[in-house]
Amino acid sequence: IVCALLFVAVDRMQSAGSAGSKDTLTVYNWGEYIDPELIDKFEEETGIKVTYETFDSNEAMLTKVQQGGSAYDIAVPSEYTIESMKEDGLLIPIDHSLVPNLQNINEDFLDLPFDPRNEYSIPYFWGTVGVVYNPNLIEEHLTFESWDDLWDPSLERKIFLVDGSREVIGMGLNSIGQSLNVKDDALLREATDNLIKLSPNIKAI
C-alpha cells in the first residue's frame, strides 16, 4: 500500500485557540517523524520557536483539527485526507514563492488529482506499508506471496495490524482482488466480511 505524506497549511481561523506569535511555528505531525535535534537546530538557526504535536492516525488528526481548540500552522496528513480538509475549509493556499525548494521535488509527486497545482499541499515523503514476518516462527508452507496466507489458521493470534483504517480496508480489498481505491458498496462489504474472518488471527492493532 503506497502512502504519501504532505505538508499542508492549516487555516488557524478554524480554531478557537489563539493565532499565536509570528515567531512561533505550530506543527502537527505523525509521531517519530522528525528528530527532536532537527527541531532544536531549526530553532537555533531561525530564532523561531516550534510547538510540535503528534498524532497516530489521519482520522485522529482530522477530528482534532475539525473540533478546533488548537491552532496549527502546518499539518502532515496522508494524501487521501487532503481533499476532505479542503472541502471542510480547513486549509489555506500555500504561497509557492516562499517555497523555493519546490522546484527540487520529483514532478511525479506534483499536480496530483487530490490537489491540482499543489495549491494546498507540498509532498513531504512517500513510502509503503507492507508485511513483515519472521520465517523461523511460521509454518513452512507460508510464503506471503498471496494475501490469503494471512488467513491461515496457523497464524491464530499472531498478527499485529497497523492502526490505519485505509491500510486495513485496503488489505481487505486486495485480498479479494480489488484496488484499495474501490468505492463500490458491495465490494467494500465483501472486503469487510473477509476482514472479519481474519479476526481470530489478530493479536493486536
Question: What do the PLM-derived regions correspond to, one by one?
Answer:
Residues 1-5:
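Core hydrophobic alpha-helical transmembrane segments of single-pass membrane proteins
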Residues 6-13, 17-85:
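Early extracytoplasmic/lumenal segment of secretory-pathway proteins
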Residues 71, 76-205:
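Extracytoplasmic ligand-binding site segments that recognize negatively charged/polar headgroups
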